């Protein structure tokens, strides 16, 4: 009977696959006939796939600490005090003054402060030169630092579109065009791009691990990728045309020129990448001691593969092996020891170790959709064991010991060697068991998060931005977008008021410490 039930499950799975293939073929035929295929309706798709979120399971097993008090009144700045007097005519004769009962009412004023600067003007006939009085620092063009700060904050913190920003400012008495708003957002007069570079460089030294994720973006109609790096102190965004290992390495090099080194580690990688022993032998003969430049690397590849169209994938793997080895040996940029990510191939082999996200792995179990009641029960029972083990790992992080690590490692082996008889589930369990080293890396490094939610939430910020602004048009606009997103999201993590911070930078006052300095300060405080 059990075998028959599993056969029913397999037939249902095959039937669903055939339905999907049949619909794809129908869509292809319709397109050839000049008609449209079946529309993709997001709500219907999600309903059919089911909820793959594990939020409720995780919430049940979180280690709850003491809740921080959120006294609202303590955080409110009082700008002025006004006494509200009692009408003495209504008071009885025995009424006695007992002080004041305070009530804080928050208010905001939106008003213009348009200034006409009368610049003194002198002319020297002998020098044939005109001398003008200097404008205040931070004043450039026809809009002051306050207006520019508000434009940048509304766009990148409030996620408002440029037409709506123009409408809002117009209602407030500021006459400004959408093209001027666009120039303010893209010209980056305050050099927030440099600020982003400083943030990333400081952040690389702040923790041994970094989280990474990516999402698609559009640049002038072309598909690009936003690579997102983060840890508890920062979030940085990098829009790039590709999402391969070399691209990730270039980001980690912080603008430093990529070089190639073929040492023992590089040759180990070449073997893992299934490069033939013949090619490896040739590389040993052609490699240069002390590293190779990009030009020298391309010359070596031309020697290995004289026919340009041949060995395209092998060329890429050879470049990756040499670039990774060179990155590990360089000392100019802080090395990332551990990358926490999903299971995407471009994040593998780059660092000394890789940690994987438990929640991402758990989604695969939530996507299983058995129809046989027995298999439904088997799946639910296993998922309970899965998330109970996740809860054990959370508890381990609060008080790690070698003994507890050994117990959890053995428990992982027991859970993920289970044979349930439900074929799809057993296949999924086997795949998880092969990721043991990456999933249990926190047993050696308890500071590691169990999930990659921080990077995924940052990717969601990028997607919410696209809801308002579908794409950037130019390289300058793309770089400005990345810089502002990095500054805004990093300021949130550091508890910095982004409006005040942007105002400080745009006005050129520089009274506030940079975000890069704050990252270093917080890191040093944690290590004391």
What positions do the PLM features span?
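Short, flexible loop/hinge motifs at secondary-structure junctions
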Residues: 1-141, 182, 212, 257-321, ...
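Catalytic center-proximal scaffold of phosphoryl-transfer enzymes
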Residues: 9, 121-123, 131-528
């Amino acid at each position: 009977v059990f075998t028959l039930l599993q056969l029913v499950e397999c037939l249902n799975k095959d039937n669903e696959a055939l339905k999907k293939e049949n619909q794809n073929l129908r869509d292809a035929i319709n397109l050839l006939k000049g008609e449209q295929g079946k529309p993709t309706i997001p709500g219907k798709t999600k309903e059919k796939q089911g909820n793959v979120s594990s939020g409720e399971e995780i919430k049940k097993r979180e280690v709850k600490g003491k809740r921080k008090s959120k006294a609202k009144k303590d955080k409110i700045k009082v700008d002025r005090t006004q006494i509200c007097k009692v009408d003495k005519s209504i008071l009885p004769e025995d009424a006695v003054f007992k002080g004041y009962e305070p009530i804080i009412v928050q208010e905001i004023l939106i008003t213009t402060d348009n200034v006409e600067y009368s610049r003194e003007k002198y002319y020297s006939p002998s020098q044939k030169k005109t001398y003008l009085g200097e404008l205040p620092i931070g004043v450039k063009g026809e809009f002051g630092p306050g207006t520019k700060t508000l434009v940048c904050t509304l766009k990148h913190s409030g996620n408002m579109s440029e037409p709506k920003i123009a409408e809002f400012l117009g209602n407030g008495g500021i006459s400004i065009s959408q093209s001027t708003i666009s120039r303010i957002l893209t010209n980056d007069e305050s050099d927030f791009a440099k600020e982003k570079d400083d943030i990333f460089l400081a952040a690389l030294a702040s923790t041994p691990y970094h989280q990474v994720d990516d999402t698609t973006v559009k640049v002038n109609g072309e598909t690009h990728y936003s690579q997102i790096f983060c840890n508890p102190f920062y979030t940085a965004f990098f829009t790039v045309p590709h999402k391969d290992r070399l691209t990730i390495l270039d980001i980690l090099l912080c603008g430093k020129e990529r070089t190639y080194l073929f040492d023992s580690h590089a040759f180990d990688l070449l073997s893992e990448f299934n490069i033939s022993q013949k090619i490896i032998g040739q590389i040993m003969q052609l490699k240069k001691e002390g590293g190779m430049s990009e030009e020298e690397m391309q010359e070596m590849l031309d020697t290995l593969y004289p026919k340009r169209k041949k060995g395209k994938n092998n060329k890429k793997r050879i470049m990756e092996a040499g670039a990774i080895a060179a990155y590990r040996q360089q000392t100019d940029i802080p090395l990332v020891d551990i990358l926490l990510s999903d299971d995407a191939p471009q994040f593998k082999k780059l660092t000394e170790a890789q940690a994987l996200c438990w929640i991402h792995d758990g989604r695969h179990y939530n996507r299983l959709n058995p129809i046989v009641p027995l298999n439904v029960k088997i799946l639910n029972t296993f998922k309970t064991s899965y998330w109970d083990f996740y809860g054990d790992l959370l508890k381990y992080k609060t008080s790690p010991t070698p003994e507890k690590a050994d117990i959890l490692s053995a428990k992982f082996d027991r859970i993920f060697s289970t044979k349930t008889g439900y074929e799809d589930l057993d296949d999924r369990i086997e795949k998880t068991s092969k990721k043991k080293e990456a999933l249990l890396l926190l047993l050696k490094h308890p500071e590691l998060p169990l999930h990659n939610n921080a990077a995924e939430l940052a990717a969601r910020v990028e997607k919410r931005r696209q809801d308002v602004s579908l794409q950037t048009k130019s390289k300058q606009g793309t770089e400005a977008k990345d810089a502002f997103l990095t500054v805004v999201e990093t300021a949130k993590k550091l508890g910095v008021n982004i409006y005040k911070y942007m105002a400080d930078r745009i006005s050129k006052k520089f009274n506030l410490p940079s975000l890069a300095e704050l990252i270093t300060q917080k890191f040093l405080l944690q290590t004391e």
